[in-house]
UniProtKB/Swiss-Prot annotation:
Record gene name: rnz
Xref: Pfam families: Lactamase_B (PF00753), Lactamase_B_2 (PF12706)
Classification lineage: Bacteria, Bacillati, Bacillota, Bacilli, Lactobacillales
One MF annotation (Gene Ontology) recorded for this entry: zinc ion binding
Name of the protein described by the UniProt record: Ribonuclease Z
Catalytic activity annotation: Endonucleolytic cleavage of RNA, removing extra 3' nucleotides from tRNA precursor, generating 3' termini of tRNAs. A 3'-hydroxy group is left at the tRNA terminus and a 5'-phosphoryl group is left at the trailer molecule
Requisite cofactors: Zn(2+)
UniProt record similarity statement: Belongs to the RNase Z family.
Length: 309
């Protein structure tokens, strides 16, 4: 499981940062990639990665400001040009209005998509659990931006315990059907009468990962709830230390506020995203240093950076 940041900037494209988009790579888990936001130029950023557009099966939009959605029509159209690849349907999750935006863009431009898009639109009345699959649950809450904006919490369901194959062999169980039964949790009896109890050879279930994606927002308790015990919290950091008033006026957060959210939520790691273009290399290091006084495990992410979860 990995995160890759396609655009980490705020507002408009900059020389060193494109606008908002990131992907959650779930290739080992379910052979899919999930995208969060799709700002202008996202498809160009994808060309710098190993991501295959057909693997992107779900797109989650935080809100309808242009720096988070202007790349969608182009990406969807280019995804249709993958002639050498099998066409796969796509699901888009986002605020009410995202379907109208996409369908009108496709219609007006005369674009033809050889795959289906399934839309899931949300408002204040439909927050909470918005998706459940065999292996993942996604929750959403409204944040505190200047327009309706959603934060997402992706929860991996607990993983099955692993089989101690060496111990099972040492107990006299041969590879074959009996081995498979124990792996599936069944108790067995060997030819000599020895009883083998599956629980003695299978570890306890492993806790699944939690990834929280916080879109544009002022500091809000909703972010703490979404980030509770998260393995990774991706939080916007448009502004730096001392810019709290400006951040509040524009519906955004500072690095210090993001660090407070991570601390209060008990998150394990904080990745600062959606950074203003005025923060360059040295400024970003200072942003990390300042935030670390509140929450130690913090990093300002860069375009195309990959983070293993």
């Amino acid at each position: 499981m990995e995160l890759q940041f396609l655009g980490t900037g705020a507002g408009q494209p900059a020389k060193h940062r494109n606008v908002s988009s990131l992907v959650l790579k779930l290739l080992d888990e379910i052979n899919e990639v999930w995208m969060f936001d799709c700002g202008e130029g996202t498809q160009r950023q994808i060309l710098e990665t190993t991501i295959k557009p057909r693997k992107i099966k779900k797109i989650f939009i935080t809100h309808l400001h242009g720096d988070h959605i202007f790349g969608l029509p182009g990406f969807l159209s280019s995804r249709a040009f993958q002639a050498s690849e099998e066409q796969t349907d796509l699901e888009i999750y986002g605020p009410v209005g995202i379907k109208s935006y996409v369908t009108n863009s496709i219609r007006i431009s005369g674009s033809k998509l050889p795959y289906q898009i399934h839309y899931h639109e949300f408002d204040d009345t439909s927050m909470g659990k918005i998706l459940e699959t065999d292996k993942f649950i996604v929750y959403a809450e409204r944040l505190a931006h200047t327009i309706f904006c959603m934060g997402y919490r992706v929860v991996q369901k607990d993983l099955e315990g692993t089989l101690d194959a060496e111990a099972l062999r040492a107990a006299g169980v041969p590879f074959g059907p009996l081995f498979g039964k124990v792996k599936n949790g069944q108790d067995i009896e060997l030819e000599d009468g020895t009883k083998i109890f599956a629980k003695d050879f299978i570890s306890e279930p492993r806790k699944g990962k939690i990834i929280t994606i916080i879109g544009d927002t002022r500091k809000t308790s909703a972010s703490v709830r979404l980030a509770k015990d998260a393995d990774v919290l991706v939080h916007e950091s448009t502004y730096g230390k001392g810019d709290e008033r400006m951040a509040r006026n524009h519906g955004h957060s500072t690095n210090m506020q993001a660090a407070q959210i991570a601390r209060d939520a008990g998150a394990k790691r904080l990745l600062l995203n959606h950074v203003s273009a005025r923060f360059l290399g040295r400024d970003c290091r200072q942003m990390e240093k300042d935030a670390a006084t509140i929450f130690e495990n913090v990093k300002v992410v860069r375009d195309l950076e990959e983070v293993i979860i």
